[in-house]
C-alpha cells in the first residue's frame, strides 16, 4: 500500500500496535521497535479498531456499514449495517460497541449477537470509552439529558423527535457492558464533556470538559474523585487522554502543541479513594479521525515531516534554567494555594489546589505548510506511553510518529529521540507474532 489520504489512526488496547486507515487501505505497525507488520489495499477505511495484537479487526468502509475481518485468514467474519453513520468503534475481548450520534449498539464478540441498544443524547463527537478488561467491562459515555417537552406532539410529516437533548453538564454514565446495567453516574464537570478515558482494568476514569482547562480522575465503579489537574488557563479542545500501564501517569494532548503528563500519586489525601488491589493498567483515548468536525478553540502548528530515523530536536532538558524557573514558580503558587485553601470551604479550595503537569513535551512544527505559510487545519494528535520504557508516543494527523524520553525523577520537558512516518512508501513487512 502506497500513498492515500490519511483518515484515521489508533493505538490498540495495550499500545503495542498502531493501526492506520487511509483512502487506499490500512496498515498495522509495531510501536516498539517501530515496524510495519501488516498492509492491505482494501477500500477507503474511515475508522479502524484492532483487538489487542490478534488478527481480528473492525473496519468502516462506508459510513453505515461495519465489517469484521480476520486479517490472517483474509476473510470477512460478518458485516453489520446501521441506521445512521458510524462515528466510533470500541472493542475488547467480550464486547463490541458501535457508536452512532444518538445510539450505542453493543454486541457479544463471541457470536456477534446484538445484546443491547442504548439511546443517548446527541453525541456527534462520539465521546465514549470501553474498558479493555473482560472483567470490569465498563462502557462510559455522556449521561443522556431527557427532553422537557416529552408530551408535545411532532407534526405528522416529521419523524418523532429524540427523547434526549444535548447535555448541559459533564456527567458520565458508567454502564456494565457484561451485566447490561447502569452502575453509576459521575458528576465530573459543570460544562459538557470533551474527552473521557478508562484505564485497562476499569478502575479509573479520566475526564475533560469543553473548556479543557481542568482534568479529573475518578475511581470506578464508586465514582469518587481521586485527582484534579490544571492543564492550563486558556480554553482548548482535548484530543486524547491516555493512562500508562501502571496507571501512575496520565498523558493529555490538545489543540495546544504541548502534551502534558500528569503524575497520579497515591497521596494521603487520595489513599482512601484509590481502588483496592494492585496497580491498575492503562488505556486511552487513543485514536483520532482526521476529518473529525469537532470545533477547535485554538490553532496548532503542524508536526514534523516524519522522516524515518532518530530525532535531533532536543529541547530544553529537564535540568535547564528555564525548567528550574518554571518549577520554582509553580512551587510558589502551590505554597500560597496551600495556605489559602486551608481557610476555605472544600468547593472553593479546589479552585486553588489543582496540580500542574509533572512533565511535558512539545510537538515539532511541520515544514509541510499550506499556502501562505499556515496550516489549513489544526494538527490533531493522539498519545500513549510505552509499556517497556519511560517514553511518550505521539502520532499526528499529518502521519508523524514521535517518541520522547521523560525523566521520571525530575520531570520537566521531554526530548525527541525518534521519529517516523506512517505514510511513507516502504511496503516491506517485518517478522512478528501479530495475529498469533
UniProtKB/Swiss-Prot annotation:
Keywords from the named record: Autophagy, Endosome, Membrane, Protein transport, Repeat, Transport, Vacuole, WD repeat
Motif (L/FRRG motif): 229-233
Localization annotation: Preautophagosomal structure membrane; Vacuole membrane; Endosome membrane
Region annotation Disordered: where it falls in the sequence: 272-323
Main location: membrane
GO terms for biological process, alphabetical: autophagy of mitochondrion; glycophagy; nucleophagy; pexophagy; protein localization to phagophore assembly site; protein transport
Membrane topology: Peripheral membrane protein
GO cellular component, one term: phagophore assembly site membrane
Repeat positions for WD: 1-39, 188-228, 233-272, 374-414
Molecular functions per Gene Ontology: phosphatidylinositol-3,5-bisphosphate binding; phosphatidylinositol-3-phosphate binding; protein-macromolecule adaptor activity
Biased composition (Basic and acidic residues): 286-299
Main function: The PI(3,5)P2 regulatory complex regulates both the synthesis and turnover of phosphatidylinositol 3,5-bisphosphate (PtdIns(3,5)P2). Necessary for proper vacuole morphology. Plays an important role in osmotically-induced vacuole fragmentation. Required for cytoplasm to vacuole transport (Cvt) vesicle formation, pexophagy and starvation-induced autophagy. Involved in correct apg-7/atg9 trafficking to the pre-autophagosomal structure. Might also be involved in premeiotic DNA replication.
Family: Belongs to the WD repeat PROPPIN family.
Domain comment (free text): The N-terminus might form a beta-propeller domain involved in specific binding to phosphatidylinositol 3,5-bisphosphate (PIP2), leading to the association of the protein to the membrane. The L/FRRG motif is essential for the cytoplasm to vacuole transport (Cvt) pathway, for the recruitment of apg-6/atg8 and atg16 to the PAS in nutrient-rich medium, and for its recruitment to and dissociation from the PAS under starvation conditions.
Matching PANTHER family: WD-REPEAT PROTEIN INTERACTING WITH PHOSPHOINOSIDES WIPI -RELATED (PTHR11227)
Subunit structure: Component of the PI(3,5)P2 regulatory complex.
Protein name stated in the entry: Autophagy-related protein 18
